[in-house]
Regions:
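Conserved phosphate/anionic-ligand binding catalytic regions in large, soluble enzymes, centered on
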Residues: 9-27, 268-288, 331-340
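Alpha-helical support elements that line or immediately flank enzyme active sites
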Residues: 18-35, 286-298, 343-351
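Hydrophobic alpha-helical bundle architecture
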Residues: 299, 310, 317-389, 401-410
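Extended hydrophobic packing segments that form well-structured cores
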Residues: 410-446
Length: 446
């Protein structure tokens, strides 16, 4: 399967790529699959299973399904209008399928969250049914992480032929040696199979623009995050504090943490974010990119493009041979993957060799092994927001540590990813985005 950098970095809304973006896309896909049968539909029923059913209310999965059935997309929905759109459906008991065909919709009956039932293929399963006089269509979808959705027959694979295909770190390094180019160049050449260079660069700078706007929004807003935990936003106050204390020798790392907090507070509030590679870990790559732009002499837009291409290459390997889904392998697959991608991107723009870049990514994966996904209240707030700040700081340190070496190291990226996958398989389900273990049961919700 060919994976583009734009598959890994997609514009969406918070708070979760697997639990918000994925269900919204699945619901819209179901409506599109109705085709000419759409006018015959009298009722639609959606059932969410596994992690989606267990933590879906906290992650906004219910709202996402309503929006997707209404024809909205994560990329284009007006985040400011979402509460009103959802409230209108709930208060009227009516839903306009695909924005074209109005039906009755009783949420208590027609949107079922199964907290302790799972489908066999993946923890994040969904079944949609449409009825006229009889059943018109039934489809099963799985939200497999990062906003990716696959159907019951598997992923609809992109069969694009790439000039330099790779699925492992070893293959990627071999390509770099054969071609005598950095990792970003290998990824760029593959991207040219889909679109011209100018479009690739413009698209990545558009991604960067959304990231920077997300940070700005996070720095401007304060108050309490939605959901009932009464978690207060901290980014705005911390920003003011850092501006008033410019002489602190450790301020660079404080800024990194600040940028991550800003993004993840926006994500927790349902704002516009970029999956990087997931929403739960969306603050790490923007934070490290902001570090590059603010603190690295000679930083440029061209460097941002190289950073994102390099991070994307590592993301391809992680998605193909590991996992970026907290419901599959715990938070090691989300924050761990984002840390690895950010560390690799930073190492390249700081002048690292392909071997040093791969080393930076490996450090990012290795030192998140075993990390659980145990969101308190099923919300992407505790421990998720702070965890992004720590993950971003670790990414900077991983890049710097790799650059102080020559690229040779005992544990390869491929071995670290294999270990992540195996650790995730051994991890109890209660530690994989179900809110039934860890902090989620030891912290009392207020």
């Amino acid at each position: 399967m060919a994976i583009s950098v734009f598959d890994l970095f997609s514009i969406g809304i918070g708070p979760s790529s697997s639990h918000t973006v994925g269900p919204m896309r699945a619901a819209r896909l179901f409506v599109e699959a109705l085709g000419d049968d759409l006018p015959r539909v009298r009722r639609v029923k959606a059932e969410l299973f596994g992690s989606l059913g267990a933590t879906g209310f906290g992650h906004g999965s219910d709202r996402a399904v309503l929006l997707g059935l209404s024809g909205e997309t994560p990329e284009d929905v007006d985040t400011g209008a979402v509460p009103a759109l959802v409230d209108a459906i709930r208060s009227s008991g009516r839903l306009c399928l695909g924005g074209r065909h109005e039906i009755r919709f009783d949420e208590d009956r027609d949107l079922v969250m199964h907290r302790r039932r799972s489908l066999p293929e993946h923890p994040n399963g969904m079944i949609f049914r449409a009825y006229g006089e009889d059943l018109l269509l039934e489809r099963t979808y799985y939200s497999v992480g990062g906003g990716f959705v696959r159907g019951e027959r598997g992923v609809v694979e992109d069969s694009t032929s790439l000039p330099h295909p790779f699925t492992t770190g070893g293959e990627l390094l071999a390509l770099c040696r054969e071609e005598g180019v950095p990792i970003s160049e290998i990824m760029l050449r593959n991207e040219l199979a889909w679109r011209p260079r100018a479009e690739v660069e413009a698209g990545l700078l558009r991604i960067w623009d959304v990231m920077t706007q997300c940070v700005r929004n996070g720095l401007e807003h304060d108050g309490v995050l939605p959901g009932g935990l009464k978690v207060r936003r901290r980014a705005k106050a911390l920003h003011a504090k850092l501006l008033s204390e410019p002489g602190d020798s450790l301020s660079a790392m404080d800024w990194v943490g600040l940028y991550a907090l800003a993004v993840n507070e926006e994500n927790a509030s349902g704002g516009r974010v970029v999956t990087a590679p997931t929403n739960g870990a969306a603050g790490i790559i923007p934070a490290v990119l902001h570090y590059y732009r603010r603190f690295v002499e000679g930083a440029s837009d061209a460097g941002v493009v190289r950073f994102l291409l390099t991070a994307g290459a590592i993301g391809v390997i992680l998605k193909t041979t590991g996992s970026i889904s907290g419901a599959e392998v715990g938070c090691q697959g989300e924050v761990g993957s984002a840390c690895a991608m950010a560390a690799a991107g930073l190492a390249e723009v700081l002048g690292g060799s392909p071997e040093q870049v791969e080393n930076a990514a490996e450090i990012g994966v290795e030192h998140h092994l075993g990390l659980t996904c145990d969101p308190v209240g099923g919300l992407v707030q505790i421990p998720c927001i702070e965890r992004n700040a720590i993950g971003a700081s670790k990414a900077v340190q991983a890049a710097r540590m790799a650059l102080h070496g020559d690229g040779s190291h005992v544990v390869t990226l491929d071995k670290a990813i294999k270990t992540m996958r195996e650790t995730g398989a051994d991890m109890k389900v209660k530690y994989k985005e179900t809110a039934r273990g860890g902090l989620a049961v030891n912290v009392i919700e207020c």
